[in-house]
Amino acid sequence: MAGLLIQEWIERSGGAERVLDEMAHTFPDADLLCLWNDAPGRFPEHAVHESWLARTPLRGRKALALPLMPVTWRTLRAERDYDWMLISSYVFAHHAHFRGRDVPKFIYAHTPARYIWAPELDERGDHLAVRAVAPLFQRLDRARAKEPLAIAANSRFVRDRVRQAWDRDATVIYPPVAVDRLLAQGDWQDAVTDDDEQRVRDALPDTYVLGVSRFTPYKRLDLVIQAGERAGLPVVIAGSGPDESRLRALAAEANVPVTFVIFPSDALLYTLMQRAAVFVFPAIEDFGIVPVEAQAVGTPVVTGPVGGQLETFTAGVSGVVASSTDPADLASAITAAIALPAFDAAATTDAFREAVFAEKIRAFVGEA
């Protein structure tokens, strides 16, 4: 059967891209379709098709392109006679429709579009163009969500959002995490081979709290710095993004050392996780792949009381839920997490293995 995998856009890194990677691995004969593809070498074994937006100045300008996305998804041209579509959606990709053809579609929902349904969780929802069209697009989005044969959500948290926004039920299929690879390596320090990264590794504090994400305001890495300061522990922040200068200014005023690691390799990133006393994750996330990775290398997690990331660990076993994301409450949770006994990383992360996802997603589209 000829299948088509669809995602809003394809970037060089990101949680949705990891899901799409595993979908492509699970369905090796499927084509891929996106609005634009900014990682052209990512799927060498697949035909990857872009929309007309990829050939315009709107390419990559997500907020500005938003008003044109619904009509773009409704006027697709089929490259083959597809038997099904599996759509990795977090904006409007689930609106996808081929002119003159009715292809059965299955939706894997990372979230109903935060831009229009939860702008308080995504600063891009404050863009003037987005605010202007949000009410209209909510009505349109709810109507289009009636079309799929079935919807899967990446967490119970998102399933509840799907019910509220789209008035549809969804089955929960957790995203795939490279748990087996993380467990197999053992000591990740030995995998760091770059000279500069070895110097970073060797200069790490003996005990520290870690924050990892893209540097954007809604990821709340500022709270990681403030919580580490309250707990009296050095802080390591890893990632990259537009909020770097603000975070560095905050770090300069902190009374504990704050180390920034920009664009770490996988080996260095997992070394940072493995050596950390606690991984702190204060953002409200739809799921949270990185907390699972931290647990897979044996590091406990601290998070706030709201979000899909609460489904990634067992409180009191491999992590602690802070009573709020106030820095003082996060600091108390850090202290409690450090005191936890060692946990079984394999057992804790088993439900998130790539093989589990592949089995469930095949069954979801009826190709088990």
Model regions and ranges:
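A charged, aromatic-enriched C-terminal amphipathic alpha-helix characteristic of glycosyltransferases
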Residues: 67-68, 325, 339-368
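Membrane-proximal helix-turn-helix segments that form the acceptor-binding/catalytic region
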Residues: 127-151, 158-160
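Short alpha-helical donor nucleotide-sugar binding micro-motif in glycosyltransferases
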Residues: 271-276, 361
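Conserved acidic donor-binding segment of nucleotide-sugar-dependent glycosyltransferases
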Residues: 314-328, 335-340
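Acidic donor-binding loop of glycosyltransferase active sites
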Residues: 209, 274-286, 299
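Active-site donor-binding segments of glycosyltransferases and PAPS-dependent sulfotransferases
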Residues: 29-95
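Nucleotide-activated donor-binding/catalytic signature segment of Leloir-type glycosyltransferases, i.e.
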Residues: 245-267
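Short hydrophobic beta-strand element within catalytic cores of glycosyltransferases
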Residues: 300-304, 313
